[in-house]
A protein has these predicted regions:
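Short Lys/Arg-enriched helix C-cap and helix-to-coil transition segments
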Residues: 58-74
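Single, function-defining residue in the core of a domain
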Residues: 1-27, 47, 52-55, 59-63, ...
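Extended, structured, electrostatic nucleic-acid-contact surfaces
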Residues: 23-38
C-alpha cells in the first residue's frame, strides 16, 4: 500500500482492531478485519510498523478528546454536581532502547536496585456517575499530586473530587480554591496540617478550620468493618457534611479502582504491540477510547432514576458487553446502522443487584513496595 494513502484515521481503525483482538491475534488479524475484501490493498506487517512511527499519538489523543466533548452535554450529575475520583496506576512497559531513552526505568526495589522492566505511572480522573474517563496523565516517575493539580483545573466549578489518604495536602487544596470546586479527602494522621492531626487525637466527632479563607470541615465516621474511625476532610456545604452522606459519597470512589481492573484485566492494556513509546501511547489512547465508547453507549441505554448514594444498586456485566462491542468494532468504525441494537438486551439480562460494602477482604501483599508494616493486611509472600 502506498504510504501516502495511509491516513491517521485508517491507522486508528487498525490499532483499535489490534488492541481489541483475542489472545494471540496480532497485526495480520487486525489488518484483515479492517481491509476485508480489499486484501490487495492491505499493507504488510513490516510496512505497518514503519507507518506507525510516522504518525504521532497526538491524533489518537485528539480522537479520545473528541469523544469526550460529544458526550459532555449528556453526562450525569447529582444535585447539579459532577463527581470525580482521582487515583494512580503503575503499568509495565517493554524494555527497549527507545523507551529507556525516553526516561522510563524500573521500579526501585532497594536503595541500589530497580526492577528490570520499565514502569509508566498513570494518574486517572474518573467520572464515577457516568463511568467514563475524564482525563489521564502519564509520567516516568510517580507524581500523582502534580497530575491531580493539573486535572482539577480542568474540572467544572460545580464538581466534587474524591481522594484517598495519599492526596490530602495544601497544594491540592489550593488548586481547588483556585478552580472554585469541591473536594473530599479521606485524611491520614501524619504528614498533614496541625489541625487535622489534633482532630485525630481528640474525642471530637466534628470540627472545622479555616485554610486561606476557606472553611474546611472534619468529620469522624466509624468504619463498620474495621471498627475504627475514618477521618474525612471536605469543603462541601455544611448540609452535605453528615455521616451518611460523606460515607456513601466516599464509597463512590471505589469506581476508579474498578476502572483499573477493567483496564488491566478486561481490556488487557499491558499486552503491548509496539516497542516504541509513540506506539505505546497510540494503544493507550485507543484503549481508553474503546472503553469510553462502550461505557457511553451503555450509559445512553440505561435509565438514571436511582439515587447514586443509595447503598443498593444494579449494574450490568461490563466485561460481557465490552467483548460484545469488540467483536463489532469493524462495523462500528464503519458506522454501520443498527450495529448496537442488541446492547439494550444484553444490559437487561446481565444486570445484577448489588450493595456497597456488602463484602470486604483484608489486603494481600505478595510483593511489598515498602519495608514498613501494613495495617489490616494478610502477608502472602512467595
Amino acid at each position: 500500500m502506498d504510504p501516502k494513502k495511509f491516513s491517521p484515521k485508517l491507522l486508528f481503525q487498525i490499532i483499535v482492531q489490534l488492541i481489541s483482538g483475542a489472545n494471540k491475534e496480532g497485526y495480520n488479524h487486525a489488518l484483515v478485519k479492517v481491509f476485508g475484501s480489499r486484501l490487495k490493498d492491505m499493507p504488510l506487517k513490516s510496512s505497518l510498523c514503519k507507518i506507525r512511527q510516522r504518525i504521532s499519538f497526538k491524533f489518537f489523543e485528539d480522537t479520545f478528546l473528541d469523544l469526550l466533548k460529544d458526550f459532555e452535554p449528556q453526562r450525569r450529575t447529582f444535585k447539579s454536581l459532577c463527581i470525580y475520583s482521582i487515583d494512580g496506576l503503575q503499568m509495565t512497559l517493554p524494555r527497549t532502547n527507545n523507551i529507556v531513552d525516553a526516561g522510563y526505568t524500573g521500579r526501585a526495589v532497594s536503595k541500589y536496585r530497580e526492577s528490570y522492566m520499565p514502569r509508566m505511572y498513570l494518574t486517572h480522573a474518573y467520572d464515577v456517575l457516568s463511568g467514563v474517563t475524564k482525563a489521564f496523565k502519564y509520567h516516568t516517575r510517580p507524581d500523582e499530586i502534580t497530575d491531580a493539580v493539573n486535572m482539577v483545573a480542568m474540572f467544572e466549578k460545580n464538581s466534587v473530587c474524591l481522594y484517598d489518604r495519599l492526596y490530602i495536602c495544601a497544594r491540592l487544596i489550593r488548586a481547588h480554591i483556585k478552580t472554585g470546586n469541591y473536594f473530599l479527602f479521606r485524611a491520614r494522621a501524619k504528614g498533614v496540617k496541625k489541625e487535622v492531626q489534633e482532630f485525630f487525637n481528640s474525642k471530637r466527632r466534628r470540627s472545622s478550620y479555616v485554610f486561606e479563607g476557606l472553611t474546611i470541615y472534619l468529620i469522624k465516621i466509624k468504619n463498620q468493618k474495621t471498627k475504627k474511625d475514618d477521618v474525612f476532610s471536605t469543603n462541601l456545604p455544611p448540609d452535605w457534611v453528615t455521616k451518611k452522606t460523606i460515607r456513601r459519597l466516599y464509597t463512590l470512589r471505589w469506581g476508579v479502582e474498578t476502572s483499573f481492573c477493567e483496564l488491566t484485566s478486561t481490556a488487557k492494556i499491558q499486552q503491548w504491540h509496539s516497542k516504541f513509546l509513540n506506539g505505546i501511547l497510540q494503544e493507550l489512547y485507543a484503549m481508553f477510547w474503546v472503553i469510553n465508547y462502550t461505557k457511553i453507549q451503555m450509559y445512553l441505554r440505561q435509565e438514571s432514576t436511582t439515587n447514586p448514594l443509595n447503598s443498593k444498586y444494579s449494574k450490568p456485566n461490563f466485561k460481557l458487553i465490552f467483548n460484545w462491542v469488540k467483536d463489532r468494532m469493524g462495523k462500528i468504525l464503519n458506522k454501520t446502522r443498527r450495529v448496537l441494537d442488541g446492547m439494550k438486551w444484553l444490559i437487561k439480562i446481565s444486570k445484577e443487584k448489588r450493595e456497597h460494602l456488602s463484602r470486604s477482604y483484608r489486603r494481600e501483599i505478595k510483593g511489598p513496595a515498602s519495608p514498613y508494616p501494613y495495617n489490616n493486611t494478610v502477608w502472602n509472600i512467595i
